[in-house]
């Protein structure tokens, strides 16, 4: 009898990997769409712009090579046109962020993985909320009602902005996603965060 055939006992690592991979792909397919579907007749042009560093990369690429993007992947680029980079960098700089670093993050496709909607406002807000929550957690004062209120408000707002993340994102990126570290962990640590 093998470990996979004994109910309630160890499951073979390959079976676990297969389940995780299946759940990962299910998540991606339910939250993202093929780039070809979003780009339509402009697919070659869009792929060229991605390769040239003018448009964000797909959020995910499936094992079969399908490039997956958020349904609104081209909304911001279409709105800004040729001024996309200048517009975003100006907005990032005005918000006190490193415009080159934020532009690189945008082009990597990472913001589409993290955010429900990718706009200059949501990218900037996420960056500021991450900084705020990290600062609050570094100086944890759970008995202080002002600190508790500030943490809860920031965590709740970040929760509204962020997607759930795919099951394998932690392995994909080599780090725990912000949802785990800055939303789920504080809620697990302090019961009052969940009520």
Indicate residue ranges for each PLM-predicted region.
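Charge-enriched amphipathic alpha-helical scaffolds
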Residues: 41-59
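Short, flexible coil/linker elements and helix-boundary hinge sites characteristic
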Residues: 32, 40, 53-54, 96
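Polyanion-binding surface elements
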Residues: 26-46
